[in-house]
């Protein structure tokens, strides 16, 4: 800064105080660069990280306040002191950003969360308006991923036709599950009330009737409904679809198994 200081003196400006922030490092403790990490704020926003999360993350690089990790703008305005920033390199850990963003997303009201999510649903071509229970589906899935794009991608099976199954999941749990699918389908079709509690009861009865451990019963059904082994509790997952759609997807899974054999 010597040149700037001389110019300030020559112009008669009062001397400024300078502060240096620590160098930002990647998880490998090498200087963060485009070659080993996403370095554009816009790229993070495009993935559905909140502005408040990025401010939180960046403010914590080289600065801390006890063991507190989650800060909102008002917190930082009152707590942040540039004098407390350390000189040593600060690590930008994407997994920590995920954790911080999870907290900031959870703090949003449902309406705020949904409004922020909608552009990501639109970008994936998901017609969420066709579902009368779209808000219920979004509420069930809102914590499935640490960013809005990930949540939107997880919602694809709920707002569009299921076109494929995860290969690894299908090979591990779906192949050979014809008896499970047919047995559970009969149980579900015998329900008088279609809600999470009644579905859970039917699943428990099916598990007892087939003498199977939970994964052997639940995962084939979960894959048939969503294409993967990742979803909320199975009773809740099934309740997000109507019985007609459940039958359609179980029948499609049975056809897939028949064609595979």
Give short role names for the model-derived ranges.
Residues 63-67, 85-86, 106-110, 126-127, ...:
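Intrinsically disordered or highly flexible coil/loop and linker segments, enriched in small
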Residues 40, 53, 57, 96-100, ...:
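A general alpha-helix detector
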Residues 57-58, 100-101, 138-145, 152, ...:
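Short alpha-helical scaffolding segments that buttress acidic/His motifs in well-ordered protein cores
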Residues 197-259:
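Charged substrate- and nucleic-acid-binding regions of tRNA-handling and nucleotidyl-transfer enzymes
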Residues 110-210:
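Small-residue-rich helix-loop
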């Amino acid at each position: 800064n010597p040149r700037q200081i001389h110019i300030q003196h020559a112009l008669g400006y009062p001397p400024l105080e300078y502060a240096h922030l620590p160098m930002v490092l990647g998880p490998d403790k090498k200087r963060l660069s485009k070659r080993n990490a996403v370095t554009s704020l816009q790229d993070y926003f495009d993935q559905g990280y909140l502005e408040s999360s990025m401010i939180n993350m960046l403010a914590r690089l080289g600065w801390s306040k006890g063991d507190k990790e989650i800060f909102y703008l008002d917190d930082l305005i009152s707590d942040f002191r540039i004098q407390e920033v350390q000189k040593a390199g600060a690590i930008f850990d994407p997994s920590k950003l995920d954790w911080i963003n999870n907290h900031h997303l959870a703090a949003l009201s449902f309406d705020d969360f949904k409004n922020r999510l909608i552009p990501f649903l639109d970008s994936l071509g998901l017609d969420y308006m066709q579902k009368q229970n779209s808000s219920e589906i979004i509420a069930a899935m809102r914590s499935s991923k640490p960013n809005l794009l990930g949540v939107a991608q997880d919602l694809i099976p709920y707002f569009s036709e299921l076109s494929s199954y995860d290969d690894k999941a299908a090979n591990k749990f779906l192949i050979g599950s014809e008896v499970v699918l047919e047995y559970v389908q009969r149980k579900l079709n015998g329900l008088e009330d279609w809600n999470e509690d009644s579905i859970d009861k039917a699943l428990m009865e099916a598990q007892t009737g087939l003498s199977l451990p939970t994964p052997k019963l639940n995962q084939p059904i979960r894959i048939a409904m969503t294409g993967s082994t990742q979803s909320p509790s199975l009773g809740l997952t099934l309740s997000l679809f109507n019985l007609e759609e459940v039958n359609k997807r179980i029948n499609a899974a049975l056809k897939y198994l028949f064609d595979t054999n």
